[in-house]
Every structure is written in C-alpha cells, then in structure tokens.
Amino acid sequence: MDWSHLWLYVSPPILGGIIGYFTNDIAIKMLFRPYRAIYIGGRRVPFTPGLIPRNQERLAKNISDTIMGSLLTPDELQKLARRLLKTERVQGAILWLLQLAIDQIKTDTNKKSAKIVAGILRDLIGESLPRLLKVLARREDFLEAQINQIFDQILLELQLSEEQASRLADWFLEVVLPPDVIRQAIVDFLTDRTIQIIDESFREKTSGTYWVVANLFGLRNTLTRLRTFCLDEKEATNNRLTELIQDLQMRDRFRKILQNLTLQNLPIGTVRQLRKTTRETVRQYIQTSGSDLLQGLTDSINWENIAELLLNRLSNSPVVMSSLEVVSQELALILERYLEKDLEVIVAQVIPILSIDQVIVDRVKSTSPADLEAAIEGIVKNELQAIVSLGGILGLIVGLFQTAFFIFSQQ
C-alpha cells in the first residue's frame, strides 16, 4: 500500500461523516428553499418554490388528518373533557361565577340587576300568581290548614286591651254616635206615622194603671213635643243628650262590652261554623276578586325599589355568602351526573362546532415557510439531535467501507 496516497484512504470516512452530519440541515433547507417561485423570462424555474411552500395547503390537510385521526380522537377528547370537568374544578368555577355575580350586583351603578329582578317579581306577583291562585282556589282544601291556624291563633284569641277598648269607646261616642247624630236619629225616627203606631200599640197592649194613662193621656202629644224640642232646641237637646250619656256612664258600658267581646265567649258549634264560613269566604273571594286584588297591589308597588333593597340585603347577607359553596357543590354534582350520561353525545356535538381540524389547517396555512422551517429546525436540534449524530456516524461508516473496498481492490 502506497502511504503517499494516505489522503485517498482517510478522506472517504471524513467526508462521509461530514456529509452525513449536515445532510439533515441541508435536506430541511432544500425542502423549504426558495420560499417563493422564481421566474426567468416569464417562466417559473423548476423546483421553485421549495417542496413544502409549494404544497403547504396539502401539508396542512395531512397534518390535520393525522392529528385528528391518531391524537385528538373522540375518545381522547372525552378523556380530556373528564379531566377538565372534574367535580373540584367545576365547583371552583361555579363558585367563582357566583361570587363574581354578587360582586357585580354590589357595583351595579345602572341598576340593571334590580330592573331584571323587578320585572321578575312584577310578572310573578301580577301575572303568574293570580292565575295559580285562581286554579288552586277551586280545591275544597285550599288554604284550609293556614286559615284555620290564623283563625284559632289570632282571631279566636283576639281581645281588646283596656286601653284599646277605651279608645274605641271614645271613638264610637265621639264619631259614630255623637249627641247631634242621636238627636237627628230621634227626629228621623219620630215621624207622624211612627208616633201613631207607638200610641196605638201602647193603648192596645197596656193594662191596669198604664191602660188608664195610655187611654186618657196617650203618647202622641209627648212624642210630638219631644220631636219638636229636638228640632227647635238643637243645642239644648245635644246638651241634654251629653248629660244623659255621662249620667248613664255609656262610655264605661261600651268599654266593658268591647273589652269582653271575644269569639271565645261564643258556643263551640258557632265558632266552628264561623271558622268554616271564614274559610269559604276567603276561598270565594280569591276565586272572584283575588286576581284584581293582586293586580292592583302590583300596580301600586314600586318593584324596582323592592328589588334593589332585596338585592342589597342578599348581597350583604352572611347566610348567602356561606351558602355559595354548598350551592356550587350541588350544581357541580348535578353537572357531573349529567356528564356521566351524556358526555359522549356532547363531545360528538362539540367537535364539529369547534372545527379543530379546520383550525389546524388554517394555522398551518397562515404560518410562513420561514417560520415552519425555523420550527422544524428547532425540533431537530432540540429533540432529534441523535438523528443528526446518527447521520454523521452512518456517513463515517460508509466512508470506512469505501476505504476498505479501495484497499482490497488495489491488492
């Protein structure tokens, strides 16, 4: 072997290793370069642009099909959804939303929440509730227990105190039956016809001494003079009636009557019948006039103020704040039971909506060839460095085989 030609034996392994090591980078660049088509004399130069830029749309479709066919399958998406929608995560999300809603209510300067709640209350009380009550009132047992309880615990036990009875007696004697009203009632009662009937009845039905007085004197003149006195002497009549009321202690008599007035003094049978009548009266009233009552009540109430007060109270209530976690947990459990049954159907419906394959295609198509080249080179350099090294080793081995073949061929 002529050692003067040593470079003939050494150069094949060295060149093979160098070529094998840099082949990947060269191949990647050849796939992408040039990025755009080159035209000479109006004709496109062959192999321009590079293979990937020229077929980028088809590459995007193939990448999308590969990912959706082997990586993001419906089963994998279901597993991903189950991991994402674990009960703890769902509960945390619901709790966050509830707290966010309460914070939004507190800072609602336009009172949008109050207007919404006001509309709900107005519809509930003014529209829905009257229709519901009208239907329920047809039942014989409608509000039976509630009305009986109110009757037994309130109406049956209702009794005026001494102060209340005194005030009511004063009002009765000063407003309902003052002396002037009594005087006018006497005048209206003592008509000529009434006086004649009283006089004749007194003459016919009396006996003994009263018969003598009735037939000799009669009551006609006396009653006529009384009526005339009430008409001519109004002030004097009122004074006499006031004195009579005081002498007869009518105020104290009325007070005692009112103070002792209670349903407990009535017979048991009467109380039971009164309770039944009360229940039927309430039921009949709700059937006939309940809708109008609630409608009038709805029109007279400022629902926005009520809704605002209600929301302020609820947003600052410690009970509401402490119950948010419980509510979120219950809602999360309900959602979990629903997903266990219908998750497969939901995922099947969500996949077309998300259009993941089209997103991948659009993303690959919108990426410039230079960015694709840089991404692939980064992957090769960081994750596939062994392939680069293996290319150099294979090039070295091929070069060694060439050297060995060259040596054996000379011998």
Swiss-Prot record:
Transmembrane residue ranges: 3-23, 387-407
Keywords tagged on the record: Cell inner membrane, Cell membrane, Membrane, Transmembrane, Transmembrane helix
Primary subcellular site in the record, as a coarse category: membrane
Its membrane topology: Multi-pass membrane protein
GO cellular component, one term: plasma membrane
Keyword Membrane set for record: yes
Domain of life: Bacteria
Keyword Chaperone annotated: no
Subcellular location: Cell inner membrane
Family per record: Belongs to the UPF0754 family.
Protein's UniProt name: UPF0754 membrane protein Ava_1421
Organism: Trichormus variabilis (strain ATCC 29413 / PCC 7937) (Anabaena variabilis)
